[in-house]
């Protein structure tokens, strides 16, 4: 029943979101980047190498990386120190902001949605994961304005670990 699920979620500290809240977070999820790039390296006579296509990125991220735990804290008013904290990745969660990329970046970091996923060098407003904002700032993006921050005090690396182990075991047994 519903109460049983709510108790399990509380016990595991998994947040229960309303539809409106889920829609806000969904703005930060864009799917994977797909584009054609030519990888070129001229080997010297004594060198050898190999190209490895990584197709298991999602399981690796789910196994090793941090996920939010518990309920978020919402910020709507900001001081200068909040801009610095966002830039340094001190808020773990989601950031709604106006951001300006540098003009000399070959591979823009932050996408926006049109008919397709677009990575451009235009100033834009959007909701992104805090680690994406930190990476963008490391590459020269400038936060123009903060509108909303939803961050989590607690994180865990164990949210999907058992799930990935289980599917990896099935995959290995069937190969």
List the predicted regions and their residue ranges.
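Conserved acidic
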Residues: 1-175
């Amino acid at each position: 029943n519903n109460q049983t699920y709510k108790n399990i979620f509380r016990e595991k500290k998994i947040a229960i979101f309303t539809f409106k809240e889920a829609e806000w977070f969904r703005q930060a999820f864009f799917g994977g980047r797909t584009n054609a790039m030519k990888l070129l390296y001229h080997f010297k006579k004594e060198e050898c190498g190999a190209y490895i296509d990584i197709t298991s990125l999602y399981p690796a991220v789910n196994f090793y990386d941090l996920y939010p735990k518990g309920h978020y804290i919402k910020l709507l008013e900001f001081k200068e120190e909040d801009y610095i904290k966002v830039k340094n990745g001190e808020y773990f969660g989601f950031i709604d902001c106006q951001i300006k990329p540098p003009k000399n970046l070959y591979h823009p970091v932050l996408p926006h949605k049109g008919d397709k996923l677009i990575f451009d060098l235009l100033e834009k407003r959007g909701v992104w994961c805090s680690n994406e904002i930190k990476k963008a700032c490391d590459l020269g993006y400038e936060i123009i304005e903060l509108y909303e921050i939803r961050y989590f005090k607690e994180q865990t690396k164990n949210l999907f670990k058992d799930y990935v182990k289980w599917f990896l075991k099935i995959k290995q047994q069937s190969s």
